[in-house]
């Protein structure tokens, strides 16, 4: 019988996936920037300029979101090391095991998450 991975393993795996995603997005962004520099520099009058600008902004936004997700994962790992993992950062109550299984980096219980929306 194989035991399921613990929170540290889940968070570590998610961290690796997120770092890989950031690296891929940064490579994509670099490629877009290089392509834009090689193409016509006049975005306003170049029919491809708007597309290149959109792709650049889209890749930059995705990379920013991935970096923010990495910070959330790192915060969860810090809470785990400090013995505060599974405790809501808002109300101090427990975070349900089902929520942690679905979102290992969850900072808040379901009640506080619902209130925040």
Where are these regions (language model features)?
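Short, intrinsically disordered, low-complexity terminal/loop segments
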Residues: 1, 116-117
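Interaction interfaces in information-processing and related assembly proteins
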Residues: 1-82, 102
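Short, cysteine/histidine-rich loop/knuckle motifs that typically chelate Zn2+
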Residues: 89-91, 111
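Short functional micro-motifs and their immediate structural scaffolds
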Residues: 95-96, 117
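Short, non-ligating residues that shape and space the ligands of small metal-coordination modules
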Residues: 97-101
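Cysteine-rich micro-motifs
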Residues: 105-114
């Amino acid at each position: 019988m194989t035991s399921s991975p613990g929170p540290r393993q889940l968070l570590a795996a998610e961290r690796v996936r997120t770092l890989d995603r950031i690296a891929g997005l940064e490579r994509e962004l670099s490629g877009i920037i290089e392509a834009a520099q090689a193409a016509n520099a006049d975005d306003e009058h170049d029919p491809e300029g708007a597309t290149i600008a959109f792709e650049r902004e889209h890749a930059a936004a995705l990379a920013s979101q991935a970096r923010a997700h990495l910070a959330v994962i790192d915060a969860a790992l810090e809470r785990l090391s400090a013995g505060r993992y599974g405790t809501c950062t808002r109300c101090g109550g427990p975070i349900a095991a089902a929520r942690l299984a679905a979102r290992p980096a969850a900072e808040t219980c379901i009640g506080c998450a619902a209130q925040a929306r």
